[in-house]
Amino acid sequence: IATVDCSDYPKPACSLDYMPLCGSDSKTYSNKCNFCNAVVDSNGTLTLSHFEKC
């Protein structure tokens, strides 16, 4: 199972780096920062499906 450490999030701004991750909501997040901010917003219900785009 792929995991991402989001313990130091949320962050107020994310870089534009493109390193896509696919969330359990079948949405592609452009990088770890955007994904982790979404995890925080979801109260931890969002998880990582896999690395790369969905």
Curated annotation (Swiss-Prot):
One of its GO terms (cellular component) is extracellular region. SMART domains: KAZAL. Glycans are attached at N43. It comes from the Eukaryota. Gene3D superfamilies: 3.30.60.30. Disulfide bonds join C6-C36, C14-C33, C22-C54. Transmembrane segments: none annotated. InterPro entries: Bifunctional_prot_inhibitor, Kazal_dom, Kazal_dom_sf, Prot_inh_Kazal-m. GO terms for molecular function: serine-type endopeptidase inhibitor activity. Keywords: Disulfide bond, Glycoprotein, Protease inhibitor, Repeat, Secreted, Serine protease inhibitor. Residues 4-54 form the Kazal-like domain. Avian ovomucoid consists of three homologous, tandem Kazal family inhibitory domains. This is Ovomucoid. It comes from Vanellus spinosus (Spur-winged lapwing).
